[in-house]
């Protein structure tokens, strides 16, 4: 069975497929480094996958894959948010520059 997820937005579509992630200790899940450095303990951290006779159980594999899939999706969405924020800042900066140019062209450079 292949574990997958799909992200759909008005301008983009992206499929995610779980790879052979070997841990339940996700990169983007759990408390932030700031919270941990402040002395908090991650009591909700999932246990590592259990094994029977040296082989990881089916549910353990599923949990590992879900953690990896969640990391992949979180990283992708974080990049999308950063790009949107950058675009918004660029647009605001362009509007400010255009307004300054129009003010100067209209002879408004003596105003203050």
UniProtKB/Swiss-Prot annotation:
An example Gene Ontology CC term for this record: EKC/KEOPS complex
Asked if Nucleus is a keyword of the record, the answer is yes
Keywords, alphabetical: Activator, Chromosome, Nucleus, Telomere, Transcription, Transcription regulation, tRNA processing
Q: Which InterPro entries match?
A: EKC/KEOPS_Gon7 (IPR014849)
Q: Which subcellular locations apply to this protein?
A: Nucleus; Chromosome, Telomere
An individual GO BP term? tRNA processing
Similarity comment: family membership: Belongs to the GON7 family.
Q: What protein name is recorded for this chain?
A: EKC/KEOPS complex subunit GON7
């Amino acid at each position: 069975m292949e574990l997958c997820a799909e992200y759909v937005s008005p301008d983009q579509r992206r499929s995610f497929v779980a790879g052979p992630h070997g841990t339940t200790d996700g990169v983007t899940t759990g408390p932030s480094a700031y919270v941990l450095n402040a002395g908090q303990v991650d009591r909700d951290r999932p246990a590592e996958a259990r094994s029977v006779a040296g082989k990881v159980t089916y549910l353990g594999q599923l949990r590992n894959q879900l953690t990896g899939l969640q990391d992949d999706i979180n990283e992708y969405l974080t990049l999308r948010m950063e790009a949107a924020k950058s675009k918004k800042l660029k647009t605001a900066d362009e509007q400010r520059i255009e307004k300054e140019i129009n003010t100067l062209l209209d002879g408004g450079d003596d105003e203050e």
